[in-house]
């Protein structure tokens, strides 16, 4: 596997796991929602989001976990477009950590574009790519708003990197299982 793949490949490769159950959720959907909650718990972040790249049969997916402080945004669900900071190509295993000042001065910062009036605030940013075997890119895991107004730490970087690697390995297992079954 190479790290370069067409947008749209993931869905076909883990298709059985992406098929909705009776409630409309998939096992992968549930897993990725839990990943966001776990990422928040590991880093004391108020917000976590995971964007899974577009699949052949489906649009890009985005999963969230928000603290009680962000209750007004619980139903905010934009179409993930991968613009601004969200569109940065973070190499596998690397983490980007920005303070609020660094976010606002970053050349990729777009202040949420046309979503600005509805988008929850973003104070600081910690993000890494979720990659599998050989750098195969699944998506982006990102956190914002460290509790108590603090900045993300070196330890937060380590925890996010390790969680993203675990998620990448889990998605690989699903993808490889489907490939073997299809062969």
Give residue ranges: language-model regions:
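Flexible loop/coil segments at beta-strand boundaries within sensory signal-transduction domains
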Residues: 56-58, 131-137, 146, 174
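Helix-loop-beta substructure at the N-terminus of cytosolic sensory domains
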Residues: 21-76, 174
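Signal-transmission linkers at sensory-effector interfaces
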Residues: 1-34, 38-42, 155, 170-183
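Short beta-strand-to-loop transition segments that serve as allosteric relay/switch motifs
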Residues: 140-150
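Allosteric cytosolic regulatory segments
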Residues: 161-168
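Signal-transducing coupling segments at domain and membrane junctions
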Residues: 96, 100-124, 145-146
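Acidic/proline- and glycine-rich, intrinsically disordered low-complexity segments
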Residues: 70-106
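A short, aliphatic-rich beta-strand micro-motif
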Residues: 123-132
């Amino acid at each position: 596997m190479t790290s370069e793949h067409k947008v749209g490949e993931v869905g076909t490769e883990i298709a059985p796991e992406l098929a909705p159950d009776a409630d409309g959720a998939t096992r992968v959907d549930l897993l990725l929602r839990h990943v966001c909650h776990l990422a928040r718990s590991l880093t004391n972040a108020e917000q976590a989001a995971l964007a899974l790249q577009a699949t052949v049969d489906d649009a890009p997916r985005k999963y969230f976990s928000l603290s009680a402080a962000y209750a007004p945004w619980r139903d905010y669900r934009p179409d993930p477009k991968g613009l601004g900071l969200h569109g940065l190509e973070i190499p596998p295993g690397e983490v980007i950590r920005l303070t609020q000042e660094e976010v606002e001065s970053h050349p990729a910062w777009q202040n949420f574009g046309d979503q600005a009036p509805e988008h929850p605030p973003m104070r600081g940013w910690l993000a890494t790519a979720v990659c599998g075997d050989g750098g195969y890119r699944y998506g982006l895991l990102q956190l914002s708003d460290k509790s108590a107004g603090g900045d993300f730490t070196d330890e937060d970087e380590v925890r996010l990197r390790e969680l993203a690697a675990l998620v990448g390995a889990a998605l690989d297992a699903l993808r490889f299982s489907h490939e073997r079954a299809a062969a």
